[in-house]
């Protein structure tokens, strides 16, 4: 993705500049985490890559989104349908709304196979479905093939969503906060499984979350977004150990440290601006404790601060 900007139509018809000059890369076999508060543009970014934004809601787009040899912004819906599910797939946040309550687990996971392999027999579809469910952590997949979503636990529904994404062995998996509704033990188990599957298959993973603690457990690289702008990116371990942007540092300070330091999270003062009320300069300037007059004159450029590390700040930490 290079220089990607997106303007959507608001509910009142006004244009909303949601994403601005977004630029990052996901390499083969790599797990890239995308972090930021709710409203930062993370999910819209994912929907843009997947081609799932309604055409009627898009006012303007600029830049490029490349997937291997494909320019995704040039594909029509029919061409995108051939790519979506087979070469790229998405794990959505809430399985009870993303899954069809009237379809069995076998039919829902197998639907993708039938769509991309029209000549596949039922036995061939079943083989793929069982393998995908096993990869997603079902110890005994055959036992649940006839189950409906309401008959599965929350953890099983999340695993079913993962199986639906993995069934065609896509090159890219996008996971949008897939463990939000689960308890800590299930989150760790599912994230570990997701990371192992991506690495074992040579797939790539884009993992979206507002929780840096969760992202730290699964990602190789970290992209931090604020108000539709990437403010910092780099190797996850380095960035977490020594953040350069005040917003990244504030997100890290917001993590609870109850075991070693025994202190509560430190909230970030203020609120995320709406897309039509972003500050004229740095998008974080209204909430930044380090803000100076120069920060309000224009959006800072992305500056390289080390190997594969970028920060969009005039006065990095």
Regions found by a protein language model. Name each.
Residues 71-89, 115, 122, 238-243, ...:
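ABC ATPase NBD coupling module
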Residues 142-145, 233-317:
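Short catalytic/signature loops enriched in Gly
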Residues 70-71, 123-143, 252-253:
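Conserved ABC ATPase "signature" region
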Residues 60-71:
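Conserved ABC transporter NBD signature motif
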Residues 167-171:
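A short, proline-enriched helix->beta-strand linker immediately N-terminal to the Walker B motif
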Residues 174, 178, 182-263:
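P-loop NTP-binding/switch modules centered on Walker-like glycine-rich loops
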